[in-house]
């Protein structure tokens, strides 16, 4: 099986750590990053845990095989709604939210039938935040 094209939506501690872990394990053919802040996008690219950045959510997910939603739970509904039409058939989507009922409601309301959603939670973190805070080892032994 070919390595997947992965998109990270949100590149704070968890998103950047996922990117670092994917890079360390050589697990993706390409990693695209997206955040609302242009500063965060540029930092992510310069740090190197993504291969490219997208200027829009729709552009970020268009070629993705897997999409990680690394954003606060309260933002997931709007993100899923905004990206739904741009998802390619067969895409797998997962989240890192701490609760699932509102996430599942958003997914049920907006995600197209040709996409698969796997709810998740990394059960990891630190007191730090932002793209500079991420590190591949955050998920080791978890």
Question: What do these predicted ranges mean?
Answer:
Residues 110-142:
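Rossmann-fold dinucleotide-binding core
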Residues 32, 54, 93-94, 118:
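Structural detector of well-ordered beta-strand residues that form the stable sheet scaffold
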Residues 39-40, 75, 100-103:
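Conserved short alpha-helix immediately C-terminal to the canonical SAM/SAH-binding motif I
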Residues 36, 71, 96-98:
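Short beta->alpha hinge that forms the Motif I/post-I loop of the SAM-binding pocket
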Residues 20, 24, 46, 81, ...:
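Short, well-ordered alpha-helices that flank and scaffold nucleotide-derived cofactor binding pockets
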Residues 28, 88-91, 113-115:
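A short helix->loop->beta-strand "cap" motif at the edges of active sites that frequently abuts
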Residues 1-62:
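NAD(P)+-binding Rossmann beta1-loop-alpha1 motif at the extreme N-terminus of oxidoreductases
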Residues 57-92:
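Rossmann-like NAD(P)-binding element
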